C-alpha cells in the first residue's frame, strides 16, 4: 500500500487544500494517476489538474501539472484521458472560468499523456449550439468511420458529444440517447462490439432518491430508439419504454 497525495477539507473553496477526482492509466510501463489538486501555494490555492507516476506502486514521482491557469479563481477539474488511433491522447475536463460560462467542457490533445499542460485548452462547441457542462467523461471507439469516434459525456445534459475527425475543433456533433443526465456518467466501449458504448449513470448530485441506469447505444445505428430503461425507486425496480433522437440506438437496465 502507498499514499500518493493527502489533502485537506473537501470543499471547492480556495484556501482549502483538497485532492480529488482521480483517474488512472498505464503508459510505457508506468501507472499514471491524475487528480485535481488544490494544495499549491504558488497557485494561491486555486485548483489545477496534475499527475504522478509509479513503476512499483510504492514510490511516486513528482507532481506534474496537466492543466493550470494563472487566475486562481479558475477551476479545471475531472480529468479523463483516452488514446487516439494516431498515438495522440485526449484529455477532457470541466472548466469553471471558461468564456462560455458555467463548467463548460474543454479538451486538450497531446502526443503524450504526460504533456497536456503544454497544449491549448479547446472548448467543445457542438454544431447545434448546445453547451456541454460539468463532470465530463470520454472514450474513443474504432467504430463510426476511418478515424473512429471520440465520445464525450457531460453531467448536465442527456446527449453524448461525438467527434469523428480526431478532435478537430469544428467537428463536434450531438447524439441524443435514452440515458438521462447524471453526476457523473461513465462510458465504456464494449470489448466484444466496439460500436456499442455503455453509459453508467448514478443520478444527480445531492439527490435524495437517485437511480442507477445502465444504457448501451450503437454508434453505427441510424435513427435508433431507446428500447428499455429502468431505475430502482424505494427498493422496487421500475421499467419503461424510452426513445432516443438522432443517430444511435440504446437500451438500459436499472438496479
Give the role of each language-model region.
Residues 20-23, 77-80, 134-137, 183-188:
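Beta-propeller and closely related beta-sheet repeat lectin domains
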Residues 224-255:
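Glycine- and aromatic-enriched low-complexity segments, predominantly in secreted/extracellular proteins
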Residues 1-17, 26-72, 83-130, 142-147, ...:
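Beta-rich carbohydrate-recognition and catalytic domains
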Amino acid at each position: 500500500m502507498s499514499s500518493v497525495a493527502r489533502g485537506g477539507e473537501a470543499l471547492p473553496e480556495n484556501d482549502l487544500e483538497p485532492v480529488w477526482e482521480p483517474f488512472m492509466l498505464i503508459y510505457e510501463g508506468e501507472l499514471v494517476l491524475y487528480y485535481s489538486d488544490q494544495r499549491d501555494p504558488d497557485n494561491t490555492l486555486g485548483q489545477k489538474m496534475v499527475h504522478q507516476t509509479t513503476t512499483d506502486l510504492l514510490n511516486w514521482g513528482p507532481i506534474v501539472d496537466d492543466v493550470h491557469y494563472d487566475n486562481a479563481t479558475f477551476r479545471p477539474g475531472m480529468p479523463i484521458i483516452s488514446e487516439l488511433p494516431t498515438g495522440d491522447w485526449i484529455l477532457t475536463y470541466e472548466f469553471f472560468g471558461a468564456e462560455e460560462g458555467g463548467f463548460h467542457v474543454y479538451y486538450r490533445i497531446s502526443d503524450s499523456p504526460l504533456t497536456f499542460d503544454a497544449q491549448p485548452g479547446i472548448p467543445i462547441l457542438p454544431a447545434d449550439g448546445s453547451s456541454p457542462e460539468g463532470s465530463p467523461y470520454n472514450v474513443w471507439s474504432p467504430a463510426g468511420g476511418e478515424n473512429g469516434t471520440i465520445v464525450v459525456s457531460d453531467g448536465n445534459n442527456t446527449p453524448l458529444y461525438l467527434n469523428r475527425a480526431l478532435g478537430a475543433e469544428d467537428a463536434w456533433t450531438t447524439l441524443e440517447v435514452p440515458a438521462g443526465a447524471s453526476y457523473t456518467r461513465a462510458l465504456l466501449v464494449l470489448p466484444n462490439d466496439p460500436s456499442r458504448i455503455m453509459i453508467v449513470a448514478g443520478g444527480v448530485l445531492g439527490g435524495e432518491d437517485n437511480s442507477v441506469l445502465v444504457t448501451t447505444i450503437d454508434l453505427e445505428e441510424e435513427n435508433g430508439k431507446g428500447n428499455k430503461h429502468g431505475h430502482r425507486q424505494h427498493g422496487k425496480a421500475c421499467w419503461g419504454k424510452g426513445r432516443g433522437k438522432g443517430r444511435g440506438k440504446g437500451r438500459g437496465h436499472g438496479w
